A protein has these predicted regions:
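Serine-dependent amide/ester hydrolase catalytic core
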Residues: 1-65
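Structural helix-boundary/capping segments
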Residues: 1-19, 27, 64-112
Length: 112
């Protein structure tokens, strides 16, 4: 039925994304993205627009779909209306690449 058709399509898309990421890791050690589309927003600020709220997490979706390890680390702040708001970057590694994430994350943070 409809459930099977959507489920099978979703799995095909997931496999395609996983293949693209796996191919990318033949050319790089980690993939770096923003953690969110913008700085942190006030609690409850986007509850009236769920799509806008979900789009803030758009960069973290790929690692969830591929099952590849990812970590977010602080990368600075930005001044929004007199308030310093945190920014972060996300590091994504290939399957079983958790140790690589810790090494790169520590280097970025100046801890190694």
């Amino acid at each position: 039925g409809y459930y099977d058709a959507y489920y099978n399509k979703a799995n095909a898309v997931r496999r395609g994304i996983t293949k693209d990421f796996t191919d990318a890791f033949t050319k790089c050690d980690v993939i770096v993205t923003p953690t969110t589309a913008g700085p942190a927003f006030k609690l409850g600020a986007k509850t009236s627009d769920p799509v806008a709220m979900y789009l803030e997490d758009i960069f973290t979706v790929s690692s969830n779909h591929t099952g590849m390890p990812a970590m977010s680390i602080p990368s600075g702040t930005v001044n929004e209306e007199g308030v310093q708001l945190p920014l972060g970057i996300q590091l994504i590694a290939p399957h079983m690449g958790e140790a690589r994430l810790f090494v790169v994350g520590k280097k970025f943070l100046g801890e190694e």
